[in-house]
């Protein structure tokens, strides 16, 4: 099999595109229009948000890779014809993919966090790191525990939908005057974001 094609299958490229689409739709179609208040600085720069979405995609891609890594023995029995880990990529190479993707995800998240909040950048980075831990824990320990495993996956997907609102909160926390001016608008967007978040949680 073509290794490039197999790599994109390994990271579930179609799933990543769907996550990116959901995140951008929530931010640019729901939240962004509501923040056109004329107040300079009410909306962070697009590069910072795009970098954060890239971070999320790297982290989730790493989660898919480590999931297949821990599933290799089961996949050898259940779907040997679709096996990628150990057949196309060795287990060591697969681990390298996971480490690289996760590192790039955390690095992108750190840079985005610093861009939107000089004083509280560690908060968003800590949440992204927690997502990394959740995805790894799901693959390594909790997948066989049906309720816990499904809960971790659902929370991870729902986080992608809630991320834009959290991003905006951390950005506005830099300037209390702007936060006060657009606070009502921010709270107005919350119910809609929560509806999409809950929908994503239960549909996973």
PLM region descriptions:
Residues 1-204:
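Multi-pass alpha-helical membrane architecture of UbiA-family
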């Amino acid at each position: 099999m073509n290794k490039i094609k197999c790599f994109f299958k390994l990271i579930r490229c179609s799933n990543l595109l769907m996550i990116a689409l959901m995140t951008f739709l929530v931010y640019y179609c729901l939240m962004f229009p509501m923040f056109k208040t004329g107040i300079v600085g009410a909306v962070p720069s697009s590069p910072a948000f795009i970098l954060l979405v890239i971070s999320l995609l790297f982290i989730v891609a790493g989660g898919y890779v480590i999931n297949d890594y821990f599933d290799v023995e089961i996949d050898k029995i259940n779907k040997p014809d679709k096996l990628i880990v150990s057949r196309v990529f060795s287990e060591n190479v697969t681990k390298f993919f996971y480490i690289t993707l996760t590192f790039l995800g955390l690095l992108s998240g750190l840079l985005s966090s610093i861009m939107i909040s000089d004083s509280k950048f560690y908060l968003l980075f800590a949440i992204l790191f927690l997502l990394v831990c959740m995805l790894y824990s799901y693959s390594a320990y909790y997948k066989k525990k049906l309720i816990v495993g499904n809960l971790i996956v659902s929370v991870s997907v729902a986080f992608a939908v809630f991320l834009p609102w959290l991003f905006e909160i951390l950005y506005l926390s830099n300037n209390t005057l702007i936060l006060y001016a657009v606070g009502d608008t921010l709270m107005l967007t919350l119910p809609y974001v929560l509806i999409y978040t809950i929908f994503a949680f239960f549909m996973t």
